[in-house]
């Protein structure tokens, strides 16, 4: 029991969120570099003479130099075992991104110093606040021209509604970037650029009152630093660890992921402030991560991960106890016992066998087609289900048809398989079949991913016609859709589970439906 507690206390599980090109994949790689998990960082854009980014593995990602799927990466650092849930950073991200946040205990928000808070960051932040998880901010690309740091922090507070407290403070930016001032230690870490960021950065640390500092920092920047230190101490938000852990205050660090600058200080601050895995709720009860009985839930399913492994894998977030390879568990939704013989951990498309894992870890389990998003597995006499993972509303819709009617079986199998993974949502007319399918996605790129995968994995080509719908609402079970008074451009459909939904072309249609149908309850997401 003591060993179990020690192992769980070492665990940290966090997701990295950002807008495209803020440097999220680069930051992820630098964490792995410092943890010794990789010897050389890749490059995000996959240049000819360099490796592809370690966390980007799907063929379409390598072609485009973007993260489309969510990766799960683990590394050890100074006695901690850290699980990074890497979310897609491209503008056209997917529902997978949201679900990954359901498996994390906290989030690292990466912001481009020249751009500030952007659209995708806002969307992902909403999910973090819904779960009240701690959010740590890394303001990246300080070695390029950046906006005023006060302005950036004010924008985070106003746009996202969370207070900020800088843990360190930048000295200049762009070509004049001289380093950061560590507020707690009252020290300056000098910026020494590393070409390409392929090795750990050299560091030189000076006390803030060291006369030598003036040799490295321009007079104007030196004077400004003294003013900033005084201003932050007098007028800045007071640091509160309690507020950080409650998701009400975001500690802010500045740096440059590409040149490795500020990565290690950020990691140290992060580990000092975070907690081991937190309890989860199941059937109204709190499940303690330290309990001996094992429990976990599926937050992601991925099929045909590459040509070498044509298979399907369910990713489980372990919530309590210890996993052991070959253990027998109870699958709550399937109402039966199963053996977990094939379990993996992943570094991009490299797989390694997992013999044991603990609360806070993520494991991939071979799935013969029995698991769905949100499923629970447990050991012990008491069976329970963790709270369902929300199905988030798609924002783009298209009608798809199979080009070759002789391949109907492959078409249906492929579309259903990809939908079960949660990459897309599929809808059909009430009482209709699978001849014509409406596909809903959170990001438009998922249409491209769907076409690519159907062609390469199922040998099926499709016709795709965009649809004008912008809003989707689930209808409370038991509602008779046929009797509803709706605008002429509203469409009645059902999802894969047969749940009734309405598709609207604009928010006026949503308001019309609510005004004309007393007591009609419309839901923005459904529970799995």
What are these regions (language model features)?
Residues 1-528:
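Structural and coupling elements of P-loop NTPases
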């Amino acid at each position: 029991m003591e060993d179990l507690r020690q192992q769980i206390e070492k665990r940290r599980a966090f997701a990295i969120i950002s807008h495209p090109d803020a440097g999220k994949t680069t930051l992820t790689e630098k964490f792995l570099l410092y943890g010794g998990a990789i010897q050389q960082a890749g490059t995000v854009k996959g240049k000819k003479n360099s490796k592809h980014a370690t966390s980007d593995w799907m063929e379409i990602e390598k072609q485009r130099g973007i993260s489309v799927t969510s990766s799960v990466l683990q590394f050890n650092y100074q006695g901690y075992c850290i699980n990074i849930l890497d979310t897609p950073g491209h503008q056209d991200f997917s529902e997978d991104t949201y679900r990954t946040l359901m498996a994390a205990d906290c989030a690292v928000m990466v912001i481009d110093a020249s751009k500030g808070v952007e659209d995708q960051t806002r969307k992902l932040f909403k999910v973090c606040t819904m779960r009240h998880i701690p959010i740590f901010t890394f303001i990246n690309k300080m070695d390029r021209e950046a906006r005023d740091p006060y302005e950036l922090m004010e924008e985070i507070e106003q746009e996202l509604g969370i207070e900020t407290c800088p843990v360190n403070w930048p000295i200049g930016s762009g070509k004049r970037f001289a380093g950061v001032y560590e507020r707690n230690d009252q020290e300056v870490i000098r910026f020494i650029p590393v070409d390409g960021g392929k090795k750990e950065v050299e560091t030189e640390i000076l006390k803030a009152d060291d006369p030598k500092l003036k040799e490295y920092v321009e007079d104007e920047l030196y004077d400004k630093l003294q003013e900033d230190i005084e201003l932050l101490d007098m007028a800045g938000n007071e640091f509160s660890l309690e507020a950080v852990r409650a998701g009400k205050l975001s500690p802010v660090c500045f740096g440059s992921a590409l040149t490795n600058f500020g990565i290690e200080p950020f990691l140290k601050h992060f580990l000092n402030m975070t907690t081991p895995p937190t309890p989860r709720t199941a059937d109204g009860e709190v499940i303690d991560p330290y309990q001996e009985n094992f429990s976990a839930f599926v937050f992601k399913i991925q099929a045909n991960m590459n040509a070498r492994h044509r298979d399907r894998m369910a990713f489980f977030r372990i919530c309590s106890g210890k996993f052991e390879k070959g253990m027998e568990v109870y699958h709550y939704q399937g109402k039966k016992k199963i053996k977990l013989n094939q379990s993996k951990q992943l570094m991009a498309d490299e797989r390694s066998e997992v013999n044991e894992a603990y609360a806070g870890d993520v494991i991939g389990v071979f799935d013969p087609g029995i698991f769905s998003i949100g499923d629970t597995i447990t050991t012990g006499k008491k069976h329970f289900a963790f709270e369902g993972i929300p199905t988030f509303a798609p924002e783009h819709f298209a009608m798809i048809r199979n080009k070759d009617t002789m391949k109907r079986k492959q078409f249906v199998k492929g579309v259903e398989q990809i939908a079960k993974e949660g990459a897309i949502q599929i809808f059909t007319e009430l009482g209709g079949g699978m001849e014509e399918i409406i596909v809903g996605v959170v990001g438009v790129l998922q249409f491209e991913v769907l076409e690519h995968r159907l062609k390469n994995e199922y040998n099926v080509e499709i016709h795709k016609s965009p649809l004008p719908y912008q809003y989707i609402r689930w209808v409370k079970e038991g509602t008779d859709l046929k009797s509803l008074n709706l605008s002429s451009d509203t469409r009645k459909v059902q999802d894969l589970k047969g749940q009734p939904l309405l598709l609207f072309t604009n928010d006026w249609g949503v308001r019309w439906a609510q005004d004309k149908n007393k007591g009609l309850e419309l839901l923005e997401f459904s529970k799995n």
